[in-house]
């Protein structure tokens, strides 16, 4: 055989071998790809099956109910006292702007305690915090029962506010830490339900109880409920995350307390000053107090932010607010509850002081809207789990503005039925949307910082409530200034005018809050490069 023929045969053989190798390699790659796809499908199916099989333990439900009950009782007594304002004004001989401190100082105490909740969670066991909240709730209730001077009532409300300030974020932290991941939206809705049922029944309970018993009986009834919550909590609470040697910086705590109190005092005293100016009295001192409180509040807030940035162990890790999505959610979570909590105050007082209804009827007017809101909070959580954040938040929050808008349109010819109906519209849509705002924001926060996010958002919620009550009470007081005594026709008309002013203010605040949420969603879309549900 010639050399050329041998070379040709060798090339043919090599070509065949290469072909076989290529074929085998392709077959192997195809098989590997198929196997990888099968493994991926199997993994996805297993993950789906695992997620679907996640269950909520009875002890977790018991823990949520026990801790949430303390927050429930605190909010219940807050809304009960709101409907009793006219009676308290007569008993203790105080004005509208003074009696509102029964609610405002409670909310301020809650708000001042919230920033400490992240430290408390890291430093102390869950059961110890729970029992401390129980003790504070009991002590506050006992003082309310025996108090016969107005300052003592305020002291009791401070004690109760601190107890609720421990209990509310503790419940949220338990849900975030111990819930199955696929059930967080629903359980956050349940947490909202525990808290929002209180405003639903608070004014009605207040009106019903005081129609047959002294108002102090409300706190007598609260004591066995607190003890029942204590029993459930002691049996169900579990410590899933170990404690650590966290450090509390006293100057940071002092700064945030001064900031919150200073800002609300500035709002309150500003209203007093305007009221005196309208009635022709000397308002110089009140304006000076307003300016001092505003400077102290803003200065303390700036100092707190400065110390938090430089501290090794900050009271609150404010760095999470550098994310514009989280920041805008926090602003909205301050503004919308400001409207919601103030709304109940305005309705009950307009009903009594303008329409002349009884305490019981005034409290009952809030019941339908608050009850439907309480029922819809878990529904909002289900929508979040099913559809994501955008639609379950923006659509209902936008429609909720219809409630105060109708109030404003009919403000000078409102009836009791209109007050109840328009509040029902607001309560229904607000509850569905607002139940998901904190959940949506915390989805952007790393796990290790979620307790800080929880504390920040709960502080925003309570500060918004305190500011809302003070703001709307101030607006009503300004409208009532110089218009005669309670019960006169001029006073009733002035209260209706003040109600119209508050409803207009509510609309503006709702629009700003909704705009913040819509902007946050757009930023999230741009950042992710895809549509966010």
What are these regions (language model features)?
Residues 60-76, 81-85, 92-111, 115-118, ...:
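12-transmembrane solute porter fold
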Residues 145-152, 234-237, 267-273, 305-309, ...:
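Transmembrane helix-loop junctions and nearby membrane-interface residues
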């Amino acid at each position: 055989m010639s050399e050329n023929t041998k070379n040709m045969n060798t090339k043919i053989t090599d070509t065949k071998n290469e072909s076989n190798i290529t074929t085998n390699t392709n077959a192997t790659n195809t098989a590997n790809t198929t196997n990888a796809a099968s493994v991926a499908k199997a993994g996805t199916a297993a993950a789906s099956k695992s997620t679907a099989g996640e269950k909520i333990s009875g002890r977790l439900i018991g823990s949520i109910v026990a801790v949430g009950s303390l927050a429930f009782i605190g909010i219940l007594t807050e809304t009960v006292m709101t409907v009793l304002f006219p009676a308290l004004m007569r008993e203790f001989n105080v004005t509208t702007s003074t009696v509102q401190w029964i609610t405002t100082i409670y909310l301020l105490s809650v708000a001042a305690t919230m920033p400490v909740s992240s430290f408390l969670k890291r430093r102390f066991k869950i059961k110890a915090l729970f029992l401390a909240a129980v003790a504070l709730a009991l002590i506050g209730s006992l003082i309310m029962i025996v108090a016969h001077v107005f300052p003592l009532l305020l002291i009791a409300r401070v004690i109760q506010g601190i107890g609720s300030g421990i209990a509310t974020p503790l419940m949220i932290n338990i849900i975030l830490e111990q819930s199955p991941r696929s059930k967080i939206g629903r359980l956050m809705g349940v947490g909202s339900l525990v808290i929002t049922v209180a405003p639903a029944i608070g004014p009605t309970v207040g009106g019903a109880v005081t129609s047959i018993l002294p108002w102090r009986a409300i706190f007598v009834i609260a004591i066995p409920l607190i003890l029942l919550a204590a029993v459930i909590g002691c049996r169900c609470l579990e410590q899933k995350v170990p404690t650590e040697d966290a450090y509390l910086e006293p100057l940071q705590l002092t700064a945030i307390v001064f900031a919150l109190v200073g800002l609300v005092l500035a709002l309150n005293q500003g209203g007093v000053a305007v009221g005196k100016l309208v009635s022709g009295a000397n308002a110089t001192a009140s304006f000076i107090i307003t300016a001092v409180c505003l400077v102290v509040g803003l200065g303390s807030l700036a100092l707190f932010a400065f110390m938090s940035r430089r501290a090794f162990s900050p009271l609150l890790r404010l760095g999470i607010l550098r994310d514009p999505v989280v920041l805008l959610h926090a602003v909205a979570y301050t503004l919308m509850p400001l409207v919601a909590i103030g709304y109940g105050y305005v309705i009950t007082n307009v009903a009594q002081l303008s329409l002349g209804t009884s305490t019981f009827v005034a409290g009952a007017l809030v019941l339908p809207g608050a009850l439907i809101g309480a029922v819809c909070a878990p529904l909002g959580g289900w929508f979040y789990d099913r559809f994501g954040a955008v639609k379950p938040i923006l659509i209902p929050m936008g429609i909720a503005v219809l409630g105060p808008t109708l109030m404003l349109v009919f403000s000078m010819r409102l009836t009791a039925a209109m007050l109840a109906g328009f509040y029902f519209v607001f309560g229904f849509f607000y509850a569905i949307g607002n139940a998901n705002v904190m959940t949506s924001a915390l989805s952007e926060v790393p796990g290790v910082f979620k307790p800080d996010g929880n504390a920040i958002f709960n502080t925003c919620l309570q500060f918004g409530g305190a500011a809302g009550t003070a703001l709307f009470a101030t607006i009503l007081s300004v409208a009532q200034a110089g218009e005669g005594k309670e019960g006169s026709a001029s006073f009733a008309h002035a209260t209706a005018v003040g109600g119209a002013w508050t409803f207009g203010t509510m609309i503006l605040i709702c629009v700003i809050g909704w705009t913040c949420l819509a902007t946050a969603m757009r930023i999230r879309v741009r950042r992710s490069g895809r549509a966010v549900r």
